[in-house]
């Protein structure tokens, strides 16, 4: 059966939301695109801090300038504005991404600023649920696991033009202190490598990061040590309207918990989705993070839930969704982590 035009658009939309940018300027070798979304959403849960309105607006700008036939300059900024806070609340806006750099043809790109950490190159493959997901080891401002500040990033696609589908990332993160201890980091390095076997439907990836820990982090009750390390590996299949992905990672003295960090955390994520030709996309996933060697606790699940979701795409710009997070944590877990289910219901307009 032939794929419909709608199904093809939706598969591209799901694969990379950033490609939905609208070009607003393209003249004299300078280009400017804008993109964003309005997510009108409500959480239903017995957990009071999660129950209620979760509406937000996300807006971004991508710019590019052709310096010469080989060298291109670029920049990107992305911010999020809460729609569930009062107008006088100064915490309603946050910067997600802010970086600038240069790209030299087959030799790769280099940029600096607030960006995605190298470990997220693997974790992104399973961060595909309609609302939840991607939270076993990836957390914002947690070393190089997700979005973070002070990142110098080198990326090379197709390995200098020699191997189709072999992509390399090298990253350095400068220390960030003077903030909440769990959001701090010392100097660190990271790398990732992915390969799609020359343009096939299958892909594999791996990543590793190592960072110095700060003095403030070592003053916390749990997980003392000079280094925070992580590694991850992933598999992905994306073809014939089917999306399958799985990820396994381990962190050392990096994953934040009550009273500090877990000395070790083992993390697993999996997702399966199917895009129907008429716009419906069901999703089934599982996320697990198990803390090990925790002072006064031993082993304990940090994250453990089944996710069942459903998205209906009216077109490439508008969708409605429901996402059910079925919490599998024990109510008497020793770290006092919430064990309530959450249902997210909403609509998204994206451009």
Curated annotation (Swiss-Prot):
Entry keywords, A to Z: Cell outer membrane, Ion transport, Membrane, Porin, Signal, Stress response, Transmembrane, Transmembrane beta strand, Transport
GO biological process: monoatomic ion transmembrane transport
Membrane topology recorded in Swiss-Prot or TrEMBL: Multi-pass membrane protein
PROSITE patterns documented for this protein: GRAM_NEG_PORIN (PS00576)
Ion transport as UniProt keyword: yes
Primary location recorded for the protein, binned into one broad class: membrane
Protein encoded by which gene: phoE
Subcellular localization: Cell outer membrane
Protein family membership: Belongs to the Gram-negative porin family.
Subunit structure as annotated in this protein's UniProt entry: Homotrimer.
Gene3D superfamilies, alphabetized: Porin
Name of the protein in question: Outer membrane porin PhoE
Induction context: By phosphate starvation.
Signal peptide: 1-21
GO molecular function: porin activity
A GO cellular-component term linked to this record: cell outer membrane
Statement: the UniProt record of this protein carries the keyword GTP-binding: no
Role: Uptake of inorganic phosphate, phosphorylated compounds, and some other negatively charged solutes.
Pfam families: Porin_1 (PF00267)
